Amino acid sequence: MAESYLLEKLKSVEQTFNELTRRLADPDTARNPDEYQKIAKSRSSLEEVVNTYETWKIAQEELIGARQVLKESNSDPELQEIAALEVNELEEKIKYLETRLKVLLLPRDPNDDKNIMLEIRAGTGGDEASIWAGDLLRMYSRYADTQGWRVKLVSESLGEMGGFKEVILEIQGDSVYSKLKFEAGVHRVQRVPATEAGGRVHTSTATVAIMPEVDEVEIHIDPKDIEMTTARSGGAGGQNVNKVETAVDLMHKPTGIRIFCTEERSQLQNKERAMQILRAKLYEIKLREQQEEVTSMRRSQVGTGSRSEKIRTYNYKDSRATDHRLGQNFSLNPVLEGDLETVIQSCISQDQQERLAELATSSAAG
């Protein structure tokens, strides 16, 4: 591996892994279940790196041996052919392992393991945009089912002809943010709306925001910045009209963010839920600002033009979903039915490649 800093990093990871293995075997650790669990989790997060590094070291030894055989087999054409083939295979294997190791050593996004709030807002397109927001809600709910995640509706504003003007889901499970963070942005649909009598294709949009859940320590909100009113749940467009004012309408004065919560059973629960959504929204704004800085830095380095917020177009006539970041088409119906794993894995892979290129540039400069 040409990059000496990577070898140093791998040796350091291996030392940490061995130390954690030693601590797990210590009877004192076993007597403290919390400590044991914490160490086991840390060790588990390094296991793939260490195993891949071991495989790489063995392949390096085998390559030295195969090259030696190749060098010494001048008088035996058959043996020379076998040795040349083995050298070739080992070089390919080592190349793959080195790329894999670089990916495994990329810094992890600290939010990757978090649960999320997923917000869908109808954009341009009137009633059809609200119906489209409802279709996206169904798509994400189905994808969450395939992942074994739990989905709960936490806030909704219904569209007049169906769907939603705005809807927020809470999604809980393993590494939710690590996958769904790539869904944030504008989703555009091109189709003949159910509301269209003339059979003309319309273009509508909905915006998806992915907000990692945050606790009160991470985002502090000054109570003076909050304006809160209560109302009866239900009413226009809703069921379960209550005589008690359980619904909460919360306004964050500095940002103008407004949240209306009706889904919980009591006013207190709705207030807590509204504050939870507000924290997630404020954190997402902060994250977006940080990401925009990184992205603009990346653009200035690689010289690409500004990217549109529009991440995907769903074209019903041609039965395809085009992901504009990947420049790739996918079959429309499976995607709408929640079969998003291929798309998301492609986005993860592209993100890793961009970060690897960035790493190579910065280490070359250093």
From Swiss-Prot:
Gene3D superfamilies: 3.30.160.20, 3.30.70.1660, 6.10.140.1950. Transmembrane segments: none annotated. GO terms for molecular function: translation release factor activity, codon specific. Its main location: cytoplasm. It is found in: Cytoplasm. The modification N5-methylglutamine is found at residue 239. GO terms for cellular component: cytoplasm. It comes from the Bacteria. Signal peptide: none annotated. Methylated by PrmC. Methylation increases the termination efficiency of RF1. Keywords: Cytoplasm, Methylation, Protein biosynthesis. PROSITE patterns: RF_PROK_I (PS00745). Peptide chain release factor 1 directs the termination of translation in response to the peptide chain termination codons UAG and UAA. Belongs to the prokaryotic/mitochondrial release factor family. PANTHER family: LD18447P (PTHR43804), PEPTIDE CHAIN RELEASE FACTOR APG3, CHLOROPLASTIC (PTHR43804:SF8). HAMAP family: Rel_fac_1. This is Peptide chain release factor 1. It comes from Trichormus variabilis (strain ATCC 29413 / PCC 7937). The lineage of its organism: Bacteria, Bacillati, Cyanobacteriota, Cyanophyceae, Nostocales.
